[in-house]
UniProtKB/Swiss-Prot annotation:
Residues 253-272 bind DNA. One of its GO terms (biological process) is response to heat. Interacts with the RNA polymerase core enzyme. It holds the Pfam family Sigma70_r4. Belongs to the sigma-70 factor family. RpoH subfamily. It is found in: Cytoplasm. Sigma factors are initiation factors that promote the attachment of RNA polymerase to specific initiation sites and are then released. This sigma factor is involved in regulation of expression of heat shock genes. Residues 229-280 are annotated as: Sigma-70 factor domain-4. Its main location: cytoplasm. This is RNA polymerase sigma factor RpoH. It comes from Pseudomonas aeruginosa (strain ATCC 15692 / DSM 22644 / CIP 104116 / JCM 14847 / LMG 12228 / 1C / PRS 101 / PAO1).
Length: 284
């Protein structure tokens, strides 16, 4: 029996997403009997090798679910990795006596993790999507003399100094006054009571995550808060956010892992912490 889980490289999609998908699709599915045997070994004996086999056999389902969230401008590899986190949480909590297959139980946890990732990052992506908007995003703060809205003279002066149209300055200023909406409860909470009903995270076909975020958006903060928050991050965290969400070609977790010589999981943690700090400063 194995009680220390060995690294599972298949959980982290690399630069070649097609190869990853091919790899996980080649892993055999478990029969009901095999699944129950493994589930009992994990549930009653804490056999982590059984957990590893259960996770590997269900990675293909994460890929399938992640594809349905491809319309938010987020890297597919990142959606898959977040879904894999949800899968591992589901395996950890799966009780073989529940009378359902693991895939039926895990789908809620997979979607929960993906939903949290989308709601954590979607607005940051949408704030600056064009080259001009990205330029404004990082420079508008330094161009402003006060916290109130820019007047027409200031708008034209900023536009001229940055080489953009006045309307783009107004548009970016408007975007930066919004705040991000937190998702509650957090998908990584350890409190079992927060997950008494995983169905709470099921998709509501009347509203997708982006629509929920837009409906909950409000405009009572200053653009200065966002820029000051960015300036308050350490250089690496700031670079990760810029490369992931504001660069012309968004970097993947794998790209940044190679750049900083750390694991993709470490980059994901740094990104999550940076986002959390950014929100905390904005909402303070």
């Amino acid at each position: 029996m194995t009680t220390s889980l060995q690294p599972v490289h298949a959980l982290v999609p690399g630069a070649n997403l097609e190869a990853y998908v091919h790899s996980v699709n080649s892993i055999p599915l478990l029969s009901p009997e095999q699944e129950r045997e493994l589930a009992e070994r994990l549930f009653y004996q804490q056999d982590l090798e059984a957990a590893r086999q259960m996770v590997l056999a269900h990675l293909r389902f994460v890929v399938h679910i992640a594809k349905s969230y491809s319309g938010y401008g987020l890297a597919q590899a990142d959606l898959i990795q977040e879904g894999n986190v949800g899968l591992m949480k589901a395996v950890k909590r799966f009780n073989p006596e529940m009378g359902v297959r693991l895939v039926s139980f895990a789908v809620h946890w997979i979607k929960a993790e993906i939903h949290e990732f989308i709601l954590r990052n979607w607005r940051i992506v949408k704030v600056a999507t064009t080259k001009a908007q990205r330029k404004l995003f990082f420079n508008l703060r330094s161009q402003k003399k006060r916290l109130a809205w820019l007047n027409n003279e200031e708008v034209h002066r900023v536009a001229e100094s940055l080489g953009v149209e006045p309307r783009e300055v107004r548009e970016m200023e408007s975007r930066l006054t919004g705040q991000d909406m937190a998702f509650d409860p957090a998908a990584d909470a350890d409190d079992e009571s927060a997950y008494q009903s995983p169905a709470h995270y099921l998709e509501d076909h009347r509203y997708d995550p982006a629509r929920q975020l837009e409906d909950a958006d409000w405009s009572d903060s200053s653009s200065a808060n966002l820029h000051e928050a960015l300036e308050g991050l350490d250089e690496r965290s700031r670079d990760i956010l810029q490369q992931r969400w504001l660069s012309e070609e968004k970097a993947t977790l794998h790209d940044l892992a190679e750049k900083y010589n750390v694991s993709a999981e470490r980059i994901r943690q740094l990104e999550k912490n940076a986002m959390s700090k950014l929100k905390g400063r904005i909402l303070a």
